Amino acid sequence: MNERALKVLEFYKIKEKLKGFVKTNAAKDIVDNLKPYTNLYEVEMHLEETMEALDLLQTKGEPPFEGVYDIRDILIRVEKAMVLLPGQLLKVASILKSSRRFKDYVGRKHEETPHKNIEDICEGIELLKGLEESIFNIVISDDEIADRASLKLYGIRRSLRDKNDSLRDRVNSLVRKYSPYLQESIYTIRGDRYVLPVRAEHKGSVPGLVHDQSSSGATLFIEPMSLVNLNNEIKELLLKEREEIERILEELSLKVYNNLDVVNVNAKVIWELDFIFAKAKFASHNNCTLPKVSEDGIVDIIEGKHPLIDTEKVVPTDIYLGKDFTSLIITGPNTGGKTVTLKTLGLIHIMGLSGLLIPAKENSTIAFFEEIFADIGDEQSIEQSLSTFSSHMVNIVDIISKADHKSLVLFDELGAGTDPTEGAALAISILENLRRRKCKIVATTHYSELKGYALKTEDVENASVEFDVETLRPTYRLLIGIPGKSNAFEISKRLGLGEDIIEEAKNNIESDSLKFEALIEKLQSKSIKASDDARRAEMYKLEADRLKDKYEDKLKIVEETREKLLKGAQEEAKKLIKEAKEEADEILKNIRELEKMGYSSTARQKLEEERKKLNSKIHKLEEKEENLNKEKGKKIKEINLGEEVYLPKLDQKVIILSKPDNRGEVQVQAGIMKINVKLDDLRLVDKPKEENKKGRKREAKLRMRTVESEIDLRGMDSMEAVYNTDKYLDEAYVAGLKEVTVIHGKGTGILRKSINDMLKRHPQVKNYRLGEYGEGGTGVTVVELK
């Protein structure tokens, strides 16, 4: 598709709107590269995938895109075997989690509507739950690793806690001892070492190492000698901790490297799905529908709207082309809205051919064009010193050299910018050249000569945009088959031009021209009514077809459900018979055992009675199973037209409308539908007896399950996190847990604030606090339950 048409028809503005619905920069790059596809198969496939995504949005809600990131830079680091940072690993895990959840989201039960294209895309997803869980279990936040990431790290941190506790006790003792010499009775930390704020004049009173001083020089930060060894031990442990963390990160990065191809494919699938669902959301937001795509150049756009015009102001218009004519000449005044019609037609086609649903009514048809050419607007080059006419002609020459039978050509004010007589003649010649090549052409003009050309030329049709002379505004409604009327006299009169001047002007025009204008006016009013009636009739027909299809689908579902129920009842009966026979065999076995053991004849008699009861039960069940295979009621022997009979297949009464044909079928009225059925399938209406329906009691079972002592919210948005936490706290309370941990990560703090706001109001929460060192710090909240 040539870039000039995409620019002139403002497809880039559509893409900017589409970007507003994507989640990742990777998907935005896909949007940037979006353009019409080069073959019909691709167009239809991408339209179908958009429609499938729209259906999933409507039936299953928002897809699981929480925590989807653009990790292309991270994957480049992995490809170079570089060690990833904790935050980068979390983004990789989030992509894996999203791809896994998306596979569940798209997965369907047998009776659900298939979404073939999206399901095929999701086939590319390979689950790496082990790697995903490894990362989430080890990495708590962008800058924190879990204590239990390894036994060694756990031991180091436990030693750190013990050393820090000892050091704090020791330093508190020193604070009390040296308090007369301190600026404040506190301790502080400088360079990971505990120090005391000693007044400068007493530095000799506190033996130790000076690490820093205040900006005024009045305070020295001294590490007492008695703390040096403990501080050194802590420093040593911190270095070991850092080394172990680096080892753990290297190990995780290696796992990502070993699965790089799978991670890469999963990420690309998620980004593609992000793009597809953005198309669906765009369609929903703009009331777009799925068009049919014609390979024969047939266009039938029903109530098409320009997608860039305000929805409250845009006027829908019908545009059709390619069946009865291949060229459409839209005439009328310059302010008549002709250019909007051109742009609407062109932009709707570019959208549809790019896999986007179109802003038009259902059952609209677009044509598959390999090229769309547009000469719209005044785009002359100042540098080239081109006039308006020359600028247009340069573009027209290019179009003529490239256009063929698979092209749509749009001309705005063809032949304008030069002498009217020469311009009109040139316009007709250009149109003829392209028409002979079987191009589909829509051209606007205000030259009257082109009206005559359209009237006398095969495959060319006149059209105009309706104009309201009362308001002096175009209605933007396209009237195909009616040439445009200038309305110059009516407009001038409305604006206050004298009646005498208007009459004199009319006298200067040939009477034939005036009659022609009057004829056009009459044709316009008749055409509008005929067009409205035809379109309304078409809509009624489509609605009737839709209802018919819907009824037939329901009929099919009823029949399938009935067969399933019948089969289920038969299976249940067989199962009961089998159980009863097994019970009888057990009784016989017991009888033989009793005989061997010398039991009394009374005991034997009782067992025989039980056996007879079971035999009776088996006989009844077998009869019931046999009856299930028979249709209800008696067969019909005589046919009486208009008689009400019973049709078991539909489980409803029907009326006989005809005698049996040579296939043994009769026509019956079932509700609003007339259908043919086998005479043998009908039963007398008085025979089917409705049994009293007994409600089944439902057994309520209390389901208890193990509740974890922590919940991981990373990768969720605030709303989802609050909902899941609220539900989790209720389950934890019922399970008897007294203390739980909510992992929200550090990040920007928005998620933590949302959780804290919810905890303040939760009825099961007694108290809560941020995690301490080793628990996860500010990346977790510890909750005490009532």
Curated annotation (Swiss-Prot):
Gene3D superfamilies for this protein: 3.30.1370.110, P-loop containing nucleotide triphosphate hydrolases (3.40.50.300)
Keyword DNA-binding annotated: yes
UniProt record, GO biological process: mismatch repair; negative regulation of DNA recombination; rescue of stalled ribosome
Single GO molecular function: mismatched DNA binding
The enzyme's E.C. designation: 3.1.-.-, 3.6.4.-
Record has Nucleotide-binding as a keyword: yes
SUPFAM superfamilies registered for this protein in UniProt: DNA repair protein MutS, domain III, P-loop containing nucleoside triphosphate hydrolases, SMR domain-like
InterPro entries to which the protein is assigned, alphabetical: DNA_mismatch_repair_MutS_C, DNA_mismatch_repair_MutS_core, DNA_mismatch_repair_MutS_sf, MSSS, MutS, MutS2, P-loop_NTPase, Smr_dom
Keywords: ATP-binding, DNA-binding, Endonuclease, Hydrolase, Nuclease, Nucleotide-binding, RNA-binding, rRNA-binding
Residues that bind ATP: 332-339
SMART domains found in the cross-reference section: MUTSac, MUTSd, SMR
Domain Smr: 711-786
Protein family per UniProt: Belongs to the DNA mismatch repair MutS family. MutS2 subfamily.
Biological role: Endonuclease that is involved in the suppression of homologous recombination and thus may have a key role in the control of bacterial genetic diversity.
Subunit structure comment from the entry: Homodimer. Binds to stalled ribosomes, contacting rRNA.
Family annotation (NCBIfam families): mutS2 (TIGR01069)
The protein, known as: Endonuclease MutS2
Protein's organism: Clostridium tetani (strain Massachusetts / E88)
